[in-house]
């Protein structure tokens, strides 16, 4: 089996179920008759561009990344510890004293669908144009956590 076929198989496994570790992926591949070293698997996962997401119970799992351009500057993700959404509003949690820095970054990005921000000491309220945009931004920001 060549690299492309192996990576296709990995993508199918990731789409079929929530897999949380490289060891789980390696075992599932082995069940299908594909033996890979940890180093090869690690390289494959990096090349595929998998994301580590958290499910509703807090368990981490791999997910295929979608090539979506983020409207936020790369520095924004550095400050976000947690993302919550209430309708068309996002609540971004930061370390103490960093919410205003994050607000300035988002305001400077001049994102058309962000109507405004309000910062506290460690919490930032981001008001989005509508709920769908808030959902998209929530997913985008949460993917970087």
From Swiss-Prot:
Q: Which GO terms describe its molecular function?
A: arginine binding; DNA binding; DNA-binding transcription factor activity
Q: In which pathway does it act?
A: Amino-acid biosynthesis; L-arginine biosynthesis [regulation]
* Predominant localisation class: cytoplasm
- Spell out the subcellular localization from the entry: Cytoplasm
Provide GO CC annotations from the record: cytoplasm
Source taxon at top rank: Bacteria
Q: Which GO terms describe its biological process?
A: L-arginine biosynthetic process; protein complex oligomerization; regulation of arginine biosynthetic process
Question: Which keywords does UniProt give here?
Answer: Amino-acid biosynthesis, Arginine biosynthesis, Cytoplasm, DNA-binding, Repressor, Transcription, Transcription regulation
- What HAMAP family does the annotation carry? Arg_repressor
The protein's job, in short, is: Regulates arginine biosynthesis genes.
The text of the family note is:
Belongs to the ArgR family.
Q: What is this protein called?
A: Arginine repressor
Gene this protein is translated from: argR
